[in-house]
């Protein structure tokens, strides 16, 4: 934290846009609080030694940011982030009610490699090895990793096998 505080004090930014791996979120948020800098990130906090993410660790900073007159905006990447904006827009402008919502993501590029990810490989592996989670009939349900899947036909990509995963949208929508 101290090195970030020194860096922020030397540059005096209005906002820090955290694009680092999610292990650093709390450290960067703490440095922002100590230096009076607003905060924005693209992915929620996850401990480095455990494949487990949830926003509660970052939400615990809410009162401190408010008391300091600072803003902290969480999950402003594509998913979560853009997916939440699309969902809110659709709910406001296109539907009276939404009873079912799937947020799907397709990585169609493989760069001619057997294993290619659209984000940090370690984080992707941690995501796909966690239990799946979804909300149905008023309750949360869990599945074994990658056990629920179906082929989806993606525009401009074609059919791809797609898997139910627990992802940050379930924490942020």
Per-region residue spans from a language model:
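Rossmann-fold NAD(P)-binding glycine/threonine-rich loop
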Residues: 42-71
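Residue-level detector of anion-binding/catalytic polar loops
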Residues: 14, 38, 71
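Active-site-lining helix/loop region of Rossmann-like oxidoreductase modules
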Residues: 92-173
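Adenosine-phosphate binding glycine-rich loop
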Residues: 61-108
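Conserved Rossmann-fold cofactor-binding substructure of NAD(P)-dependent oxidoreductases
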Residues: 1-13, 20, 24
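Redox-cofactor binding/interface segments in oxidoreductases and associated redox assembly factors
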Residues: 16-18, 41
């Amino acid at each position: 934290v101290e090195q970030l505080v020194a860096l922020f004090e030397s540059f005096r930014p209005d906002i820090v846009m955290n694009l680092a791996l999610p292990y650093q979120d709390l450290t960067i948020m703490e440095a922002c609080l100590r230096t009076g800098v607003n905060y924005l990130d693209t992915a929620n906090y996850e401990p480095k030694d455990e494949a487990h993410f949830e926003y509660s660790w970052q939400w615990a900073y809410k009162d401190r940011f408010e008391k300091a007159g600072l803003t902290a905006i969480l999950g402003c990447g594509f998913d979560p982030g853009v997916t939440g904006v699309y969902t809110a827009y659709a709910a406001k402008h296109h539907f009276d009610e939404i009873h079912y919502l799937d947020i799907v993501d397709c990585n169609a590029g493989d760069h001619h490699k057997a294993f290619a990810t659209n984000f940090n490989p370690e984080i992707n592996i941690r995501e796909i090895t966690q239990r799946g989670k979804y909300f149905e009939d008023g309750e949360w349900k869990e599945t074994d990793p990658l056990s629920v899947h179906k082929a989806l036909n993606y525009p401009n990509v074609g059919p791809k096998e797609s898997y139910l995963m627990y992802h940050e949208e379930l924490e942020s929508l």
